[in-house]
Amino acid sequence: MSNSQKPPSLQPNEIIKRTKPDYNWKVIVELGKGGYGTVNKVIKVNEEGFAIDDKEYAMKTEQKFASKHSSRLKIERNVMASYSKCDAQCKEHFPELIDFGQSPVWKWIVMTIVGPSLEELKMKYKPSDIPPSTILQCGLQTMKAIHDFHQIGFLHRDIKPANYCIGYGSKSETIYVLDFGLARKYRLPEWYCSRASHRCEELGRRDDYESWFFMFIDLVDTTLIDWKGLTRPDAYAKKQELFTKLKTYEKEPMFKVISIYLDTLVYDSDVKFGFLRDAITDYARSCKLTLKEPLVWFKERNDNESGSTPTTSATACSPSSSTGTGTGTGVSKIASNIDQKSIASDRNEENSLDGSKTGTWKSTKTRNKKPSRK
């Protein structure tokens, strides 16, 4: 099959056969579609095609002919297999890798299903509908996800609201980071990419946090992120101006603290997660805000729930990421059983990201010299 040809989508009720005969996957409905494949809601079924239980999952596919170098699904599977070995508290913000395999047309992975992305929620809710507590908790959870991702030895490199999703149904108070196709061992969308990315410098842990910071600012006050749609040079200049402005910004003191700290970091700096977390929690305390209130969509679900269908719809990251253009929340009121055999069979091909084994911290490149931050 040539790259110009696209395989048909998986169809509802289609059965995806596994190597192991204990169960197969049945497609329920398509959740999303991208350039290389689809995301579908699936369930486990027996050989006769009957459901084994009432659990639902997300199957992410990629066209089989995707080249070794362009296969984001392969990288994503490697990353997920790596953190699957970690303790539960270290992966609470990551979707679980359930299964993976391939057919004559598709490569696929199955993971826990999630709810809407933060990008979708920004478009769904009016600014006045999102309480300050929810915004701050989103900031803390999304930042903790980055911290945990760095702890297992990876940079995400694609931090944006579309790559964070709330949990599905009763788990909608937890925020998950997804879409690890650009992850590397120790290119971002234009809106949220760090300034180092504009300068074509090697990206480090600091840059994931800077992208998170732009995303957090956009959740709090959309008027500050004013470079959407600009060219890269103009967007870079705007980001430089914003950091200069925030260092004396009294309207949101936590922005001042965070921006000053981030500008002290260089490529190989060990980012102090506790310092950034305290900047948010101290601000919440000064504003007499509690961070134990239910997130607004979780509260809405409980208020509307009739005992059957959850209000948060299932979704998953598109196989080919796209940047949303929806209106931000503008909440400036804040101031007021993995198949191990399959893994082993592909180990020679897939045991590396940037030439280094998964689960380790060292890169193959010697980093004796810090890149210039001028």
Swiss-Prot record:
Q: Which reaction does it catalyse?
A: L-seryl-[protein] + ATP = O-phospho-L-seryl-[protein] + ADP + H(+); L-threonyl-[protein] + ATP = O-phospho-L-threonyl-[protein] + ADP + H(+)
The UniProt annotation puts the region (Disordered) at 302-374
Q: What Gene Ontology molecular function terms does this protein carry?
A: ATP binding; protein serine kinase activity; protein serine/threonine kinase activity
Q: Give the GO cellular component terms, alphabetically.
A: cytoplasm; nucleus
Point to the regions of Low complexity compositional bias.
306-324
Residue spans with biased composition (Polar residues)? 334-343
For the ligand (ATP), the binding residues are: L31, G32, K33, G34, G35, Y36, G37, T38, V39, K60
Locate the Protein kinase domain: which residues? 25-296
Q: Which GO terms describe its biological process?
A: signal transduction
What are the positions of the active site? D158 (proton acceptor)
What keywords tag this UniProt record? ATP-binding, Kinase, Nucleotide-binding, Serine/threonine-protein kinase, Transferase
PROSITE patterns per UniProt: PROTEIN_KINASE_ATP (PS00107), PROTEIN_KINASE_DOM (PS50011), PROTEIN_KINASE_ST (PS00108)
Which EC numbers characterise this protein's activity in its record? 2.7.11.1
Basic residues: which segments have biased composition? 364-374
Question: According to its UniProt record, which protein family does this protein belong to?
Answer: Belongs to the protein kinase superfamily. Ser/Thr protein kinase family.
Under what name is this protein listed? Putative serine/threonine-protein kinase ZK507.3
The species this protein belongs to is Caenorhabditis elegans
